[in-house]
Amino acid sequence: MNVFDEVINATVVNNSVTGHFTTTLREELIITRTNLLSVLHKDNEGRLVLAYEWKLSGRVHGLSLVPHKSGLGRLAVLTGRGRVSIVRFDAENQTLETESLHYYDAKFEELSALTVGAAPRLEQEPAARCLLVHNGDCLAVLPLRGHEEEGEEAEEEEEHPAKRARTDADGRLVGASTVMPASHLHSDIKNVKDMRFLRGLNKSAVGVLYQPQLSWCGNEKLTRQTMKFIILSLDLDDEKSTVINMLQGLPNTLHTIIPLSNGCVLAGVNELLYVDNTGALQGAISLNAFSNSGLNTRIQDNSKLQAFFEQPLCYFATQSNGRDILLLMDEKARMYNVIIEAEGRLLTTFNCVQLPIVNEIFKRNMMPTSICGNMNLETGSLFIGFQSGDAMHVRLNNLKSSLEHKGTVSETLETDEDYMELYGNNAEKEKKNLETESPFDIECLDRLLNIGPVTSLAVGKASSIEHTVAKLANPNKDELSIVATSGNGTGSHLTILENTIVPTVQQALKFISVTQIWNLKIKGKDKYLVTTDSSQTRSDIYSIDRDFKPFKAADFRKNDTTVSTAVTGGGKRIVQVTSKGVHLFDINFKRMMTMNFDFEVVHVCIKDPFLLLTNSKGDIKIYELEPKHKKKFVKTVLPDALKEIIITFGVILESNMCNKYINGLEKSEEPQLLFTFVTADNQIVFFTKDHNDRIFQLNGIDDFRQKLFISTYQLPEDINPDPSIKQVIISRLGHKHKQEYLTILTFGGEVYLYRKCIDNPDRFIKCDHELLITGAPENAYPKGVQGVERVAHYIEDYNGYSVIFITGTVPYIIIKEDNSVPRIFPFANITLVSMTRWGENSVMCVDDVKNARIMTLNLDRDRYYGNKMSLAKIYLEDPLEDFQTLNNITYHERTQTFIVSYAKSIDYVALSEEDEPLVGYNPDKIHAMGFQSGIILLSPKSWEIIDKIEYGKNSLINDMRTMMIQLNSNTKRRREYLVVGNTYVRDEDIGGTGSFYLYDITEVVPEPGKPDTNYKFKDIFQEDIRGTVSTVCEISGRFMISQSSKAMVRDIQEDNSVVPVAFLDMPVFITDAKSFGNLMIIGDSMQGFSFLGFDAEPYRMLTLGKSVSKLETMCVEFLVNNGDVYFLVTDRNNLMHVLKYAPDEPNSLSGQRLVHCTSFNLHSTNTCMRLIKKNDEFGKVSRGFGIYMPSFQCIGSQADGTIFKVVPLSEASYRSLYLIQQQLIDKEVQLCGLNPRMERLENPFYQMGHILRPMLDFTVLKRFATLSIPTRMTMASKAGRQAHAEIWRDLIDIEYSLTSLNKIT
């Protein structure tokens, strides 16, 4: 009974294509990040701007943009093990519409003798005649028709009348699929490595790289080279294939086919081969010293490159001036240029050179995943995604000169032009020295932040490490942050995940009496600060430029509550509105006019030169400042229909959404002033100054429908006053590129966001991008709106961003990055009563204890606000050393420091168990890569390195944790120590060895000028042991060290020596271990995991239960729910399993067999899990006699940058949410036609779990909050009569489970 939620969306870009999908006006970039599909466009400066984004239910393995005669392509999306969705952009609803859905995975499993792979591939035929899906030795061909011109269609229909009848019958854009094993194409095809369509042929042709007899370097001398390449011509109508040619005896390291204009390149780890479209091997390039020299063709020796092209290979191919230009990127993001030039069938140029990039732009990037763009000799623009490092949009500045230079180099390599020799009859090996390449300049135009792969997590103080900021309490006091190790190689870094926004405090003030503040700017400078205290009915003025001294103004209404005040009249007048009147002053507060009212003013909007008042009776008044002398306000005539309407809120907005209904402005895009009002029956109405008694309304807003549109207002026959809309703002949100949004704040604290359609300014579409739930209807979440009133404030320039603040007990900020959707974050960890703009790009905020802080948006350390939590990157830099990969992190609570382990790559040193060089070791040969590890002590105040310890060569730290170790068995005294588990990486024929280290962190005298360097590592104990150390774990005041397959518990003595006290043997190899009190779970690499108990009197480890399934365990963690013990286990197949210790169940054999509850598909590899406390948003849970039972939840990380949480649920909550999830899946239209239930639960373990109690998906459940009110009520009624409010409470409790990080308990 748990729910899964992604608290950080995936950041690794795994697919990208360019083309026209949503508009024909500009080329678009379409990318996927696991299950996130984004459409972006490029501005004039090359920055990426998000146009649309959708979160899909499954992982996307491939993308292809299919041409269509409408001009807008259809997007083919490959998910699962072989599911293709063909979708188009629905401009009316701003969403994806599925045109065709094809499930091949079941057929693949039927045809395949082996388990179908989890990473299928999607290919489009160059002439867009068909799509090819292949997974292992199975393939499916899907004919396409949507791109064909009318003449082509008629010709094909004459030749194939059956096809014409089938097309006319269903009107589909695709034909009938053909699914077959690869051996159907040719009987010899087996163990397919790659399959691609070839270019430059009249008919569809496919190249297949396969290895009928598997071979590797260990048996290569016996099997020889068994790789084969075959070119087949396909007849899509008759489902036949014809062999064009077959090549045998190719190197076993080949893995990728790269189609070119008149041939293809076969890329391998050690060589590149060029094969023309007739199947003739015309040339080869050796890339390193391990390349195959026995090929029957001309070989160009480029072994000095020492390049290794591992799979998967990232490449970009284009054509210029009759030459094929191929850009390759290896695992370390080094770029290589391959030029292929031919005269007819005669290959004249085939050369590979490494491009010397002068600005080291890819220094922090590794493992490219996708590349797309456009490139010609004048300019080149590419988008490159990386597994490690930010995705980058780059410009190749001096491409033309670089390619011209490389052309000269390739010509010097031509020594023989004999035709037969080039075709391999008398091939010879040719060796030439390469000329030096000219510097290659690449300019980064924009980046998409990537924090993957995330390898380790720790929870500790980062933003709250300082108790005071600017002499006031830290606005992020008591907050804990999640700090993760991210990335590989030089680009590895720490990522800080903040649950709230961490502002930069510039100045602080202390007030005695204030409930609301205003900043009056005179001539562009902050001049006056006006405050009011409604409890004491008093207002004051302070002179800002005189260090906030009180300003004496005799005419100012001090003994009254100020509702609003602002500068008007072009900066020459100041207006003060109190609860009983309006007062007009000059800029020195000399009175010019006063208007007194016999009603109470409750809301005011001042927008030069207009003044809008809303009174307590629901009436409005609008005044305009007399334009000539600006000495009085003139009443504006209102439409007659307003007399029949009860108004709850009024505001003056600027927008062009009503222009098409206004005479003379039908084609204008200029924004107009709109007097906007919210009625008691939750309608939003507008009118202009010259209204002619014409009022407009926003249809559908009363039910918060998905689409809103403008129309002429018609007074309803019956008005049922039930106000729920509190405030309305139409504003432009963003950074460099701002977009117009409609923001609605309700009395229940809910925030709804609608985006204005670009093509139809009179229409708005609801944003359903997993926005943070801030409130609930029916008073289901009173905590959110009690105490301090929630008020929305639009800030046009908040350190460059246009944002919306919402004050209250829990304040929020709505912010949008240019390349992301809008996000809602809690703002700091304090209550905000009032706020006002300040300076150029800051705000002044007043909290509930009268403290005022001037704050601006924190943009330090690559801080990013485009994901579901605030992210910041910390690069650990040392001028003398590159730490490379950071792989583990832990937090030392006593000293409030973080410890990070690193593993840097070195040349492998072949040493024996006695640390002597192995017999036959030759230091002059090319080395394999080894590791050398160490640990770093960091201060979160400055993230500077305090202390460092480096271990010997071949060392690799697999795990380290801080633990409370018992020092004395009599006094039970404990101390926090650091335990480090280290393994020595050696040859496979040498027994594994390791070591563990015990450290204390002690306080020392800091270095001069470096107050943070006041802690150092203190060595307590260390020991070399037999067996590799893969994990360490605390257990009941002792610590467990894994030694290959043995778990050894050790105890520390009073003299700081360490002795083993208990052990347990596991079947194969220990991968992970976690403890909870005196209970422990230990995961095995092949045989699942065991549930153990530890007893100290006498010392022993008791096996309480084992998993029945033989899981290939990756990570394990406890999940405790209301006294019940559950286990979370992830395996190598990207599955998360939930098991339970239930000795009372009859099939558990008194608990010896752990009960399998459910299995849940993860879309990426899990790397780490941690148990943390759960926040109970609606009160603490007690269990008998008033005993408080703390709640827990699990957080985890994945290789694609995702951070997730698993939250346990009560029985009642699970039942109602399960019903809602079923309704959402069955009743709502799913993107790309994907079934969320199938994408998450379809796996081999489905039948083993409780089918009616699967793990819930919060991504699906959260859609409930974005539904229209009638749809929500209908769904909630299925769960019970009073279930609507309970469902909202359950959603909020899950949403705010991580708020436990904001509280020190």
Curated annotation (Swiss-Prot):
Subcellular location: Nucleus
GO CC entries: mRNA cleavage and polyadenylation specificity factor complex; nucleus
Chain segments carrying region Disordered: 147-166
Residue ranges of the TM segments: none
InterPro entries the UniProt entry points to: Beta-prop_RSE1/DDB1/CPSF1_1st, Cleavage/polyA-sp_fac_asu_C, RSE1/DDB1/CFT1/CPSF1, WD40/YVTN_repeat-like_dom_sf, WD40_repeat_dom_sf
Family per record: Belongs to the CFT1 family.
The name this protein goes by in its record: Protein CFT1
Source organism of this protein record: Eremothecium gossypii (strain ATCC 10895 / CBS 109.51 / FGSC 9923 / NRRL Y-1056) (Yeast)
Gene designation per UniProt: CFT1
